[in-house]
Amino acid sequence: MAGRSWLIDSNRIATKIMSASASSDPRQVVWKSNPSRHCPKCQHVIDNSDVVDDWPGLPRGVKFDPSDPEIIWHLLAKSGLSGLSSHPFIDEFIPTVNQDDGICYTHPKNLPGVKSDGTVSHFFHKAIKAYSTGTRKRRKIHDDDFGDVRWHKTGRTKPVVLDGVQRGCKKIMVLYGGKAVKTNWVMHQYHLGIEEDEKEGDYVVSKIFYQQPQQLVVKRGDKAEQEVSEDIFAAVTPTADPVTPKLATPEPRNAVRICSDSHIASDYVTPSDYVSAHEVSLAETSEVMCMEDEVQSIQPNHERPSSGPELEHGLENGAKEMLDDKEEQEKDRDNENQGEEDPTWFDSGSQFILNSQQLVEALSLCDDLLGSQDREENTNSGSLKDKQPCIADYAHLGPEDFKRDLEECQKIVLDPSNIELDTPPEFRLSQLEFGSQDSFLAWGTGKTD
């Protein structure tokens, strides 16, 4: 069974293509030609009136939309350059305007085939000078309905490359009405050569369309291009690994002041090196977190947690930790402010006063530590010294004896420079003068020197 057939010509093909791209009903297209042929036997004229079904043309979406290099190719063929010849149907898609004023002989809405629905129309025409002298090209249009309007160039002239070589240029112009009123009519004009201005008498191609309001128009292909771009972005974007948030910027570790007496503490630390206990703990915490980040960064990829719900959960936990840390810092500042008003703080603000029993126990621990070091040194040297009286004895005597000796210390004046700490003392502890709790720690440390 033979399929359906129709008689067509170049005009009908071009008309169908233009109608397929338009928003109007293709069934209401007015044909400008009626293709026909004669029967070779009886010379009967055969046309499409004998066909039961009208020729459906081409599906909606088929359009003539050449790229910039393709337009330059058609322009070269129209001008007879580079040995090119025009396509037999090119006049149906890019008609030639032969008026004396070129494309500016009338308002763009009056040009053949031009519509205001956003479809594009192409025209061949020659470049014409506006005046007999000079090089300025004609841009002004005399219109009885809209008055004088003019095409104004916008932006810079862009080169058009064909087969790796610049063969033409492109200009973009906008139509302005009276009193510099901008319209939605846009024209892209193409000419041959590498110069910005076209030569008089040479053919140019003008692509004219009525730009639709941006809020009402969705450009064809934008949605598909956006989806493709998202797919490409997802394919090339590396998977993000969760990172433990840093609560504070790590700072160089500084020595902590352990003595309030300036003449003793100067041997160990300087006032500028002093940091509070809270700052030290915060710096140590930050260093531990940085070490964890470095360990995670050198783990193999298959051991790393993948992004997804776990990543979101990790980020939420990190944000929560940062908020908690901020609250803790505020509380620390409040505590520092309260500490300045509390008389139980030292002048240095670094230690809280201990009661007598706690102080004795702390000194006992320090003395045991120093004693163990002395025993190790004596063992290594092969000699063994007798046990010497030490501060730890007060842990067995009780706090009352310690308080009494401290009170007596305030009444006795003694020069500590003549004391030899390496020999057993010939005096009671009450004969020594202690300035503060830190003095005991510094004095105990001096045994190891």
UniProtKB/Swiss-Prot annotation:
SUPFAM superfamilies the UniProt entry points to: NAC domain
Keyword rRNA processing: no
Gene3D superfamilies in UniProt: NAC domain
Residue intervals of the NAC domain: 58-211
Gene Ontology molecular functions: DNA-binding transcription factor activity; transcription cis-regulatory region binding
Induction: Not induced by zeocin or ionizing radiation treatment.
GO cellular component labels: nucleus
Tissue distribution: Expressed in shoot and root apical meristems, in lateral root primordia, in the vasculature of young leaves and in the root stele.
GO biological process terms held by the UniProt record: DNA damage checkpoint signaling; regulation of meiotic nuclear division; response to gamma radiation
Outcome when changing S430A: Loss of hyperphosphorylation
DNA-binding region: 167-217
Keywords: DNA-binding, Nucleus, Phosphoprotein, Transcription, Transcription regulation
Composition skew (Basic and acidic residues), residue ranges: 324-336
Pfam families recorded: NAM
PTM annotation: Phosphorylated in a DNA stress-independent manner. Hyperphosphorylated on SQ motifs upon double-strand breaks, H(2)O(2) or zeocin treatments. Hyperphosphorylation is required for SOG1 function, and unlike constitutive phosphorylation, is ATM dependent.
PROSITE patterns, sorted: NAC
Cellular compartments annotated: Nucleus
Region (Disordered), start-end ranges: 324-348
Function: Transcription factor regulating the transcriptional activation response to gamma irradiation. Required for stem-cell death induced by UVB or by gamma irradiation. Not required for ATM activation, but participates in pathways governed by both ATM and ATR sensor kinases. Involved in DNA damage response (DDR) system that regulates cell cycle arrest. Functional homolog of animal p53. Regulates SMR5 and SMR7 transcription. Regulates DNA repair and cytokinin signaling separately and plays a key role in controlling lateral root formation under genotoxic stress.
PANTHER family in alphabetical order: NAC DOMAIN-CONTAINING PROTEIN 73, SUPPRESSOR OF GAMMA RESPONSE 1
Description of its domains: The NAC domain includes a DNA-binding domain and a dimerization domain.
Protein name, per record: SUPPRESSOR OF GAMMA RESPONSE 1
Protein source organism: Arabidopsis thaliana
Underlying gene: SOG1
